[in-house]
């Protein structure tokens, strides 16, 4: 704060910092007090010219006294990032290419960064050029910008509709009613904050760590949107012709092609929920055009670097447990998400470890996956433009038409794709051709909207997540990330994070959809230790109607407790011996942890497969069930011990087609 006070060109932002408080409490500190205290802060301070130009634009005067309290907060809070325990951002740490800073600002918005094509200066949020950088102070870095940082207040749908190269998707969002579903729902957010206002700022003590109470539940979305050229080139749509008011004058010709193509890709007389298809009303969720659009939409607003979580994948050296480096990636990393609507689809996002680390939708790959392999990608199924939804490149910003359009909305993000994405039978078949390993965080989409995954630890009230229901009153839900808890390092979790549920827990978890009808083996992965619990698992197609599957599972066991002692450290054994040991372990309902991820802090070299037999990482085979797309399935977990301080560990699941389980070639160890 001293630097700002000493610079007369920053007097306006200094004045606002002295007026604006951090938080709604009556005793909340002003930003000037916050910035004068210890911490790690990144400040993009607008100079006086920038502040006055912004105030003039808002209120027709340069007088700061004309600003409302909301306007003052908008200016002041948007330019500050609280980096917490991590280092503040100097310019060498800035993301480029339209990617966003990994930590949100004080308005819970992720800020993008590009470089000016002329002088290579950094540009924040599309128009705030850094005219001075890297003023290092005792508690962070200050950068001076020439515009006030003011992220869009439009919804995701509104930004799509404003993009001049997405007129077709913008119109389809409106006609199908999905634009209304993507609207800003601040009333829900405010209701949650009001209900839990007395818990704001409080913590719960658990596993020797103070867990902050999750005081917000933001409602946000992610959309993948075709540019107009995708429909023109892939489906033969006419190019949109637009009048002076922005209306598409040849819409009927475009709609005719869209409707025809959607019928081709969804030819069934019933949708996945066995509802008769409505061919006339696009707002009916069984309508083929509605289903086409819905497959592009996700609950949870994610900046592009939040699609996957890098932490302990094979051969990746994260360097820092509390802030893994965003470089040196080694293997493909992916996650799965359920799309919106009653006809939930399964959408896979993969990041490659090469080049600029691009992201792809529904990339189906083959790997060097032998026992002595490296898991490097060998090949990927090629894109068939307009015919499938396979292997589509995601663009981080919308600049595909020579003009940059804002894709960072108040309630989420949209990302351009250059080919039409369809969830037809070929796409589903390819998705169902591989083992689906799904992290628990992606099942609980509210986490995606809180800028929490991999960055924060938290305690959640037991009614927080839509996909966790029928929760007993004594159940407590915690989210943990290695590096952020007091007990850090040497974890054996997939992606380095986990949920722990304690108390006399009893809850039901909604599972992701399967892409094709068929029989699937369902597995649950966990890192075991003597603080865990024992529980009964139930399966069913209704949260209120589940049946027990198998015997109770004990997450406290060591490998010596498995009947017949089939677990063997096979790191020096022959391939034949390894396969035999794996079969013996499967016969008891267990599998070793995948070779794909490693013990935290081992620089990606010590895989969890053979680590610490007294507290192993294992997969339990829960059940094999016939499952259909369009139907919802649930697992219930009920504590089987009296102790209320024991932990149920929720990490990841695998859904494996029986064609892989029963194949002649044994399943890979990855």
Language-model-detected regions and their locations in the chain:
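Conserved, compact domain cores that house catalytic/ligand-binding motifs in diverse enzymes
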Residues: 20-21, 172-218, 458-504
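Aromatic/histidine-rich interaction motifs
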Residues: 52-128, 244-399
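FKBP-type peptidyl-prolyl cis-trans isomerase
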Residues: 44-54, 136-151, 224-234, 404-423, ...
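Internal, charge-rich low-complexity segments
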Residues: 177-196, 233-261, 541-571
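Extracellular/periplasmic catalytic domains that process cell-envelope and extracellular macromolecules
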Residues: 35-37, 105, 116, 136-137, ...
């Amino acid at each position: 704060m001293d630097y700002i006070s000493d610079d007369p060109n920053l007097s306006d932002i200094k004045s606002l910092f002295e007026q604006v408080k951090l938080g709604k409490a009556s005793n909340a500190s002003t930003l000037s007090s916050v910035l004068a205290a210890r911490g790690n802060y990144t400040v993009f301070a607008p100079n006086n010219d920038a502040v006055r130009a912004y105030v003039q634009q808002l209120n027709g005067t340069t007088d700061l006294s004309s600003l409302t309290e909301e306007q003052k907060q908008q200016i002041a809070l948007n330019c500050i990032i609280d980096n917490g325990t991590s280092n503040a951002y100097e310019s060498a740490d800035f993301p480029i290419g339209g990617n966003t800073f990994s930590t949100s600002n004080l308005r819970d918005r992720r800020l993008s960064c590009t470089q000016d094509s002329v002088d290579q200066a950094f540009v924040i949020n599309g128009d705030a050029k850094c005219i001075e950088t890297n003023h290092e102070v005792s508690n962070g870095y200050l950068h001076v910008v020439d515009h006030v940082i003011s992220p869009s207040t439009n919804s995701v749908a509104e930004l799509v509709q404003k993009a001049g190269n997405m007129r077709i998707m913008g119109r389809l969002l409106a006609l199908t009613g999905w634009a209304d579903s993507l609207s800003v729902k601040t009333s829900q957010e405010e209701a949650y904050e009001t209900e839990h206002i007395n818990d704001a700022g409080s913590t719960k003590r658990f596993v020797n760590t103070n867990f902050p109470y999750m005081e917000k539940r933001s409602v946000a979305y992610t959309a993948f949107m075709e540019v107009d050229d995708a429909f023109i080139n892939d489906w033969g749509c006419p190019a949109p012709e637009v009048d002076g008011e922005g209306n598409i004058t040849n819409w009927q010709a475009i709609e005719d092609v869209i409707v025809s193509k959607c019928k081709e890709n969804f030819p069934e007389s019933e949708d996945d929920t066995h509802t008769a298809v409505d061919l006339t009303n696009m707002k009916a969720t069984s309508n083929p055009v509605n289903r086409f659009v819905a497959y592009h939409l996700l609950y949870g607003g994610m900046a592009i670097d939040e699609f996957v979580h890098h932490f302990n994948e094979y051969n990746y050296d994260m360097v820092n447990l509390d802030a893994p480096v965003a470089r040196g990636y080694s293997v493909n990393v992916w996650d799965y998400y359920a799309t919106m609507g009653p006809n939930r689809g399964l959408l896979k996002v993969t990041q490659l470890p090469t080049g600029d680390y691009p992201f792809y939708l529904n990339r189906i790959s083959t790997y060097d996956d032998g026992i002595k392999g490296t898991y490097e990608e060998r090949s990927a199924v090629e894109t068939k433009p307009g015919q499938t939804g396979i292997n589509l490149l995601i663009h981080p910003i919308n600049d595909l038409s020579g003009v940059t359009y804002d894709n960072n909305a108040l309630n989420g993000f949209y990302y351009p794709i250059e080919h039409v994405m369809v969830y037809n039978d070929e796409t589903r078949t390819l998705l169902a051709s591989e083992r689906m390993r799904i992290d628990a965080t992606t099942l609980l989409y509210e986490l995606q909207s809180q800028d929490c995954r991999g960055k924060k630890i938290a305690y959640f009230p037991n009614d927080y997540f839509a996909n966790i229901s029928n929760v007993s009153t004594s159940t407590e839900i915690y989210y943990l990330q290695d590096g952020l808890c007091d007990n850090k390092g040497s974890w054996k979790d997939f992606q380095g994070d986990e949920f722990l549920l304690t108390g006399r827990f009893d809850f039901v978890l909604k599972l992701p959809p399967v892409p094709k009808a068929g029989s699937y083996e369902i597995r649950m992965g966990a890192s075991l230790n003597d603080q865990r619990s024992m529980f009964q698992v139930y399966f069913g197609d209704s949260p209120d109607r589940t049946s027990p599957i198998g015997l109770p599972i004990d997450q406290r066991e060591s490998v010596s407790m498995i009947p017949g002692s089939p677990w063997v450290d096979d790191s020096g054994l022959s391939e034949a011996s390894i396969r035999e040991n794996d079969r013996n372990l499967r016969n008891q309902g267990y599998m070793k942890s995948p070779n794909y991820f490693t013990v935290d802090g081992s620089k990606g070299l010590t895989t969890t497969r053979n680590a610490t037999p007294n507290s192993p990482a294992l997969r339990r085979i829960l059940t094999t069930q016939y499952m259909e797309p369009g139907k919802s399935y649930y697992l219930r977990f009920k504590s089987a011990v009296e102790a209320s301080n024991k932990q149920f560990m929720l990490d990841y699941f695998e859904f494996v087609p029986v064609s892989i389980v029963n194949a002649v070639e044994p399943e890979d160890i990855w």
